[in-house]
Amino acid sequence: MTHKFTALATSLLLAPAALFAQETAPEAERISMSQAIKSAQSSIDGGVLEAEIETEGDALVYEIDLVRGESVYEVTVNAATGDVMKQSEEQLTSFLSGLFQEDELRAAGTARDVLMTALTELEGQDSTWIEEVSLDDEDDRMVYEVELTDATGERELLIDATTGEITPDD
């Protein structure tokens, strides 16, 4: 009887630790957003419109929308390995043109180095994981809206697509 009680008590004591390990393991085992974007851009040489981490089945993946010329590409990158899993091309029909304004498409093509420098800087900070990046027009300037998780919790920042300046998203 005491062995059963000891086993039960040990299980109850270790359960929270196991749960915590399960929650934090994906971050420790995944590549960074900037690495995922580089992987996608090695497949499709384009500027970033949007990028986010998602769960697809039982795997974490990055879905990255890139623009090149008159086409938008969705590239799926395995978050554990960095391998490109799939890609699809969408022509800029009137529907897609409505989703992505001409200024956004142009800015995505020219902001490539600025974005990567800023993301690398953010990811260099302790325990920082970028969850989503999205190009948008805010107050007549093109910015990347960034959602990240760090030691202080979840935050949203803006990266100026021209200068690379990082500011809080108020």
Locate each region found by the language model:
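Long, terminal "pre-/pro-" and other extracytoplasmic accessory regions
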Residues: 2-12, 19-170
